[in-house]
Amino acid sequence: MAVQQNRKSRSRRDMRRSHDALTENALTVDQATGETHRRHHVTKDGFYRGRQLFAKAADAE
C-alpha cells in the first residue's frame, strides 16, 4: 500500500485543488420556442438552433 514519505502542507494541498472548481452552465434562450436550455444542447422540445430535430415524445400511460 502506498504511504506518503512526507506530509503535504495546506498550501500544496490547496494549490493542487485550485483547478477543481465547478463552473455554471451557460444558458441561452431558444429563438423558436423561447425555452431556456444549455448552449449547444437540444431543448426538451427537440429544437436545436431554431430547427426541430425530433418530435417530442408522447406521455406514457
UniProtKB/Swiss-Prot annotation:
One biological process term in Gene Ontology: translation
Ranges of compositional bias, category Polar residues: 25-34
GO (cellular component) term, any one: large ribosomal subunit
Compositionally biased tracts (Basic residues): 7-16
Record-given protein name: Large ribosomal subunit protein bL32
Gene that encodes it: rpmF
Highest taxon, organism lineage: Bacteria
Keywords: Ribonucleoprotein, Ribosomal protein
Record SUPFAM superfamilies: Zn-binding ribosomal proteins (SSF57829)
Source species taxonomy: Bacteria, Pseudomonadati, Pseudomonadota, Gammaproteobacteria, Moraxellales
InterPro entries recorded: Ribosomal_bL32, Ribosomal_bL32_bact, Ribosomal_zn-bd
Record has Flavoprotein as a keyword: no
Sequence segments annotated as region (Disordered): 1-44
Family: Belongs to the bacterial ribosomal protein bL32 family.
GO MF term list: structural constituent of ribosome
